[in-house]
């Protein structure tokens, strides 16, 4: 518990500083979305109250506008097609927790909930780090405590933390991603040098708990479907060793649970709700069998992203987006560096799935997405935080700089400047989003 004191204090200080930046910034925003939303649900007198004007109105920026707008609808569903790209799970949670449907009550509930979930994610990551690295080398438990402490501190001021002052959905996925990985860690014991033991007594934690957590993370943020590679990796491992029963009861069953809920959310429900009278993506069924017509070439989410935000292979690779590539560059570098570092330093089966997930995620964002969002959504994967923390602990021990230390040092310096700047840009409704 003593090791958690520093991360908790650091978390509180960072949040106070960020909210101070927001409160002291000018009240005008670059975009009119906030004013339009406020005009729809609030009186002029309400919007001009001191804390509303100086804090809460400013937190309605970028995606948070859509989350709160959906939370305020009569049926709890988005009003327009493009709004389905923003987590209905998160908006529904806000709506269900809020004690009333008053706009500012909903907004304040969302902000409190956001901070609580963000804090819980930090605590979960602390224990996940300690368990993961304690298992990798039980002779160095004190080092795993140091690693966990610094990782939790880093998480508090990660590259997307400015967005998480407002009601954003990402911390919910961070929390359940970490809980899912933690459940798997609890269920699987490493066998030195290159093996895993799947304990039958821990099947509930692996098959039910981890799949439940990964499902929530994925339904909230679809990029978390990559966490399913844990199950692919474990299935291959067990099948190669002819442990077919364990393969079926552990990773195959768990993976099917996540996949079924993902298909239901991304394909089945949108097809049933939208495809009776429309064409476009609805007419692109992959299987010519009526009960499975909902399995289309594109999901509703993919269609919205390509139609409304022009996502696609190399679509973002244009000269005018060079600044956005530069905004995301430090995070791309630290993510790729972490995969090479742990492939070289920790060639352990416990980290291999996460290395693959990190590489796949980074490449997908680089080629298909708005690259600057990597700063906001990448922290559902903790590998780069572990990389920075491990180098910090090792440098503290021997005081010798390596190539990795220079990368880590540069990234930390960038974070020191980036977090307050990005918080300010978010308040003004300015890029990068």
UniProtKB/Swiss-Prot annotation:
- Principal localization reads endoplasmic reticulum
A GO molecular function term, named singly, is: glycolipid mannosyltransferase activity
Q: Does the keyword Endoplasmic reticulum apply?
A: yes
| Recorded metabolic or biological pathway in which this protein acts | Glycolipid biosynthesis; glycosylphosphatidylinositol-anchor biosynthesis
Q: Which GO CC annotations does the UniProt entry carry?
A: endoplasmic reticulum membrane; glycosylphosphatidylinositol-mannosyltransferase II complex
Q: Where in the cell is it found?
A: Endoplasmic reticulum membrane
Q: How does it sit in the membrane?
A: Multi-pass membrane protein
Q: For this chain's UniProt record, which GO biological process terms are given?
A: GPI anchor biosynthetic process
Q: What class of enzyme is it?
A: transferase
Q: Which keywords are on file for this protein?
A: Endoplasmic reticulum, Glycosyltransferase, GPI-anchor biosynthesis, Membrane, Transferase, Transmembrane, Transmembrane helix
Q: What is its EC number?
A: 2.4.1.-
Pfam families, per the entry: Mannosyl_trans2
The family line of this record is: Belongs to the PIGV family.
Q: What is this protein called?
A: GPI mannosyltransferase 2
């Amino acid at each position: 518990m003593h090791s958690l004191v520093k991360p908790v204090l650091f978390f509180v200080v960072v949040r106070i500083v960020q909210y101070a930046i927001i409160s002291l910034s000018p009240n005008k925003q670059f975009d009119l979305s906030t004013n339009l939303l406020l005009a729809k649900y609030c009186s002029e007198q309400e919007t001009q109250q001191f804390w509303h004007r100086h804090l809460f109105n400013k937190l309605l920026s970028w995606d948070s506008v859509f989350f709160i707008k959906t939370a305020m609808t009569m049926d709890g569903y988005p009003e327009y097609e493009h709004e389905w790209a923003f987590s209905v799970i998160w908006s529904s949670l806000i709506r269900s927790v809020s004690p009333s449907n008053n706009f500012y009550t909903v907004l304040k509930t969302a902000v409190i909930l956001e901070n609580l979930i963000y804090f819980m994610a930090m605590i979960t990551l602390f224990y996940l780090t300690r368990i993961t690295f304690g298992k990798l080398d039980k002779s160095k438990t004190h080092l795993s405590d140091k690693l966990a402490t610094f990782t939790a501190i880093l998480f508090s001021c990660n590259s997307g933390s400015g967005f998480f002052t407002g009601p954003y959905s990402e911390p919910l996925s961070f929390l359940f991603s970490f809980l899912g990985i933690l459940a798997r860690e609890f269920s699987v014991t490493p066998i030195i040098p290159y093996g895993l033991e799947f304990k039958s007594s821990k099947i509930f934690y692996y098959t039910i708990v981890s799949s439940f957590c990964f499902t929530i993370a994925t339904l909230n943020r679809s990029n978390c479907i990559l966490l399913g590679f844990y199950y692919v990796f474990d299935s291959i491992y067990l099948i190669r060793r002819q442990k077919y029963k364990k393969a079926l009861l552990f990773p195959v069953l768990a993976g099917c649970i996540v996949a079924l809920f993902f298909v239901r959310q991304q394909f089945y429900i949108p097809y049933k709700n939208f495809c009776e009278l429309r064409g476009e993506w609805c007419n692109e069924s992959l299987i010519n069998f009526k009960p499975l017509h909902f399995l289309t070439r594109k999901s509703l989410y993919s269609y919205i992203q390509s139609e409304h935000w022009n996502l696609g292979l190399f679509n973002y690779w244009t000269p005018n987006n060079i600044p956005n590539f530069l905004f995301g560059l430090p995070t791309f570098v630290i993510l790729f560096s972490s995969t090479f570092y742990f492939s070289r330093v920790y060639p352990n089966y416990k980290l291999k799935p996460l290395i693959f997930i990190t590489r796949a995620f980074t490449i997908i964002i680089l080629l298909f997405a708005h690259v600057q969002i990597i700063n906001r959504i990448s922290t559902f994967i903790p590998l780069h935080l572990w990389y920075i923390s491990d180098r910090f602990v090792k440098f503290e021990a021997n005081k010798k700089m390596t190539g990795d230390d220079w990368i880590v040092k540069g990234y930390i310096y960038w974070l020191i400047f980036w977090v307050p700047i990005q918080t300010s840009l978010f308040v003004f409704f300015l890029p990068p989003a």
